[in-house]
Amino acid sequence: MKHLILAVSIAILLVSCQSNKKEEATKAVQVATTEKTFFSKDGRTVTPETYPRDETSRQLLKKQDLVGVNAFIHSNKLTPTDDQPIVRMNRDTYYSMAFIDVSKGASITMPEIPEGKYMSIQPVTEDHRIQAMKYGSGTFDLTTHTGTHLYVIIRLDATFTEAEVKKIQDKMSINANSSNPFTANTVNEESFTTVENALKAKMPEVLKRDGFVNATKGMFTDPNDSSIELFTQEKYELGAALGWGGAQMIDNIYETSGNYSTDNCYELTFEDPKNLAFWSITVYDKKGFMFNDLANYSSNTAQANEDGTYTVSFGCGADSPNNLDINNPSGVFNIVVRHYQPSKRVINDDYRIVPFMKEVSNEQ
């Protein structure tokens, strides 16, 4: 009888173990096909190491929900302040996004544009590694070192009119030999948010430690080109949280400031870096979102001083040169300077603009 009881107990234990294993396996392979199903209570715990891929999965699913695979999302208007899906977007360029299955080969074709105008194509891989930009018109092959899909960001400079942008966008095309949907393992939303907030909170410390020149080095790189020499795991994680979809330094150099109080007035006076494309300065709130339609000035829009330098003012009133309003509910603001196709002075000599920021007065 004892042997029978023991045998039954062992059988029950084995069945229970197998059941638990099946439940664990089910949890492990929960797959999301939409952004809505990406977050799950039983999803995988997000860590700083996994965050770049996890945030990229979320972005891919979001675009797939909107247009499916091998399709464009065009905006022939500059980014509206009431619709900013990604932190630190800007109004210096018009955006098109494409979500493409490249598993069996794919290419993208861009139409002719007038000489001197800016149009760039930037592929982002599933693990948030950033390929170097391609410029101008032509047909460009698309490949990836990992996964099966690419997120492609296309930028047209703000000197185009909305009508001109629409005509250009209508002539863009995708040629792909496969159209399989993208899927991702589900993740736990609480851990995702905790990690994201912790990464964003590290930036002031990194700015203090590395300085304005080196703070963003290593955030946006490709394992298959020379940018890999700049890669660090820490900066890779920070880049995904602070500026998902950012560009390689050869294409765009970013300068990020700390937070400034909105109680004061500030000015930046600097020499023109003479970038191959243009520079821009954009104002954000504490969380990294624009809060006014007039959120930026660029070398295409700012009025230069008589000596060829530029002054951009922040919260100094309408009579101040190139003034940007800084009032917003967060009580602080920060800026990002972007160098599009940066000059040798910016790349090789580390010329930066943010260090010239000075408090002028307490009056707005």
Can you say where each PLM-predicted feature lies in the sequence?
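Sec-dependent signal peptide recognition
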Residues: K2-A7
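C-terminal motif of bacterial Sec signal peptides marking the signal peptidase cleavage site
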Residues: L14-S16
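A compositional/structural signature for long, glycine/proline-rich flexible linkers
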Residues: K22-Q364
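Bacterial signal peptide processing site
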Residues: Q18-N20
